[in-house]
């Protein structure tokens, strides 16, 4: 029995060193809607496959609706596997990446031999399925990947430093770029809650009936490249997401040279400043602020300082920067897993494993 365990560990170490293992990214079924958090998971999987790792998308049901085609070129080659198919095989040398919302999946996978890591993109979802009084550490999880330093600090403090978090910021694809055509009197709007969108445009048309020819465009559910093209032709982007911790949509707008008018979220994004957007803490004022900006746009008198501050952000959060962080952080996680497995070997076996590695 002891020899079997030794052989298993040595085999797992060898496979990790040779990249002969799988990284499963568990995702929710968005029914084909391309939401930013799931798109970011696909980006991690795509980059890891480019680096030679066997990254796969893991979902619960056989009838999962993939979003790969809506993300653009390079995503449709990512393999998908469902739990329902009963074809999932997980080994000691494999990894499962679980979004923060799925505490139930963390509990269900607690006895699997693989390394499990939580992917925190929205701190507000941490408690969604977490049983009161329970911690991720109760399910054997102590490692987290997140998207910002603020969220890293929040998670580590929340779990009393028993969780170690690594930061890989979100990237904004290159197809988010300024349009070569004049902007249209269209306001692109993205809200987490559909009711916020309805309240904003109804209040706007009620308060300013002379601007009824201005169009509001709901940006949710569009394929990514269509989303980017539609955003770039707008004269203004409106963003309401109180529990956002990163702010992907406003960054996409800024990269497209479209000013953002938004409600400051509870966890203020690290990139946000008083001068790089039209920010407010009062949701009631959003319709009035839209009208004020629209009047300035018609008169070609938008604040130039706003555009200058937007320019400073345009080179940030690139795909190249994210790829570097993915390479670094996942490489670190894999090496730590190797060391963890070696620590479970007797001394003579550790020396043997080190000699094999050399």
Task: Name the predicted role of every residue range.
Residues 37-40, 153-227:
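Conserved catalytic-core segment of nucleotide-activated headgroup transferases in glycan assembly
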């Amino acid at each position: 029995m002891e020899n079997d365990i030794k052989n298993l560990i040595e085999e797992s170490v060898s496979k990790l060193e040779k990249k002969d293992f799988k990284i499963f990214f568990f995702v929710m079924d968005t029914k084909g809607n391309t939401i930013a958090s799931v798109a970011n998971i696909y980006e991690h999987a795509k980059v890891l496959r480019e680096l030679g790792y066997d990254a796969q998308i893991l979902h619960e049901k056989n009838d999962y609706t993939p979003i790969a085609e809506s993300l653009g070129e390079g995503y449709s080659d990512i393999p998908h596997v469902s739990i329902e198919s009963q074809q999932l095989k997980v080994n000691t040398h494999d990894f499962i990446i679980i979004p923060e919302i799925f505490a139930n999946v963390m509990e269900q996978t607690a006895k699997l031999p693989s390394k499990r890591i939580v992917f925190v993109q929205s701190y507000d979802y941490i408690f969604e399925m977490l049983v009161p009084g329970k911690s991720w550490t109760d399910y054997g999880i102590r490692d987290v990947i997140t998207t910002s330093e603020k969220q890293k600090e929040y998670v580590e403090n929340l779990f009393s430093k028993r969780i170690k978090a690594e930061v890989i910021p979100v990237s904004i694809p290159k197809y988010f770029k300024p349009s070569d055509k004049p902007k249209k009197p269209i306001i692109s709007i993205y809200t987490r809650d559909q009711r916020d969108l309805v309240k904003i445009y109804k209040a706007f048309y009620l308060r300013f009936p002379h601007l009824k020819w201005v169009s509001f465009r709901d940006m949710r559910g569009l394929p990514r490249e269509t989303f980017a093209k539609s955003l770039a032709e707008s004269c203004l982007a409106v963003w309401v997401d109180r529990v956002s911790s990163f702010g992907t949509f406003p960054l996409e707008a800024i990269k497209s040279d479209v000013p953002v008018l938004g409600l400051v979220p509870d966890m203020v994004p690290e990139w946000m400043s008083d001068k790089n957007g039209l920010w407010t803490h009062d949701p009631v004022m959003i319709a009035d602020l839209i009208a004020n900006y629209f009047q300035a746009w018609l008169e070609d008198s938008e604040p130039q300082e706003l555009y200058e501050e937007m320019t400073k952000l345009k080179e940030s959060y690139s795909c190249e920067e994210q790829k570097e962080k993915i390479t670094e952080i996942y490489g670190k996680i894999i090496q730590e897993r190797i060391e963890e497995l070696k620590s479970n070997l007797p001394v003579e076996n550790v020396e043997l494993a080190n000699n094999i590695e050399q």
